[in-house]
């Protein structure tokens, strides 16, 4: 008998800087209601879903950016999402900016800021938390850039690794579920760490601009979308899992986000894709038994992986020049 779960990518249109959290939460609750009518069991919302993508804005005093962060979850403002989960018997994934009061690597207690995602059960319990590892952009104001990308200024590198949880969801007694956030999707190491935990369903949110604002050169819009999809499709195929990738889309604070949310199967095929720049719900019926073929044949890790040949991946960070041939 098939192990089916109906999932949804709940793409959000733009959230402007002046809009309060309550506006975004109300839109997400409406998407959950729509998902309920379609028989969805798990809804995936984007990265930083409660506010505008604030790392494009520069604050000289980082503490001034704290207005964009959550200090508790659920909070009074996000409680309607948890209530909707219980009302509609739907699990959900939510990306947000987190302030945590916890010890750092030296053991010092302090305020720490992370780009975070959580997985919430239909009962409103937080099943899993993930903090973004691969932070793009820069830490200081760059006058050469029309739009800043200051994730390295406002967030610390995630300290929870890439965890997977085996938990009930929908009608399934157990699903192996993991998360990543935005830029993580471009790093095959992230997918492989999840794959090595037999992940069956990967959830990720993103806020990706249509244009690459780096000074290094121009990247066409169609390539931006292609590279996003390529990363997700390859990750799902090479680790025999489903992926639900949900975007923020449209023109937000004058910056265009390309959207194109997708749901991908373990063969790397796109099962559903968003076509608008607005709030949009795309759904797919995922048979988790489809994960078995890949992980017992081509990607049977226990039979074919050779970690002794991959030590450079963990021993080295930047690229180095190869040995020069002296023929």
Language-model segments: which ranges?
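Short beta->alpha transition motifs characteristic of CBS
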Residues: 51, 118, 129-136, 262, ...
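A short C-terminal boundary segment appended to hydrolase-like catalytic domains
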Residues: 292-327
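Active-site catalytic loop in hydrolytic enzyme cores
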Residues: 83, 100-230, 297-300
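Metal-dependent catalytic neighborhoods of phosphoester/phosphodiester hydrolases
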Residues: 49-66, 103-107
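Short beta-strand segments enriched in small/hydrophobic residues
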Residues: 1-15
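N-terminal phosphate-binding loop and adjacent alpha-helix
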Residues: 12-33
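A short, N-terminal amphipathic alpha-helix
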Residues: 27-42, 81-87
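CN hydrolase (nitrilase-like) catalytic-core segments centered on the catalytic cysteine
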Residues: 72-93, 173-176, 182-282
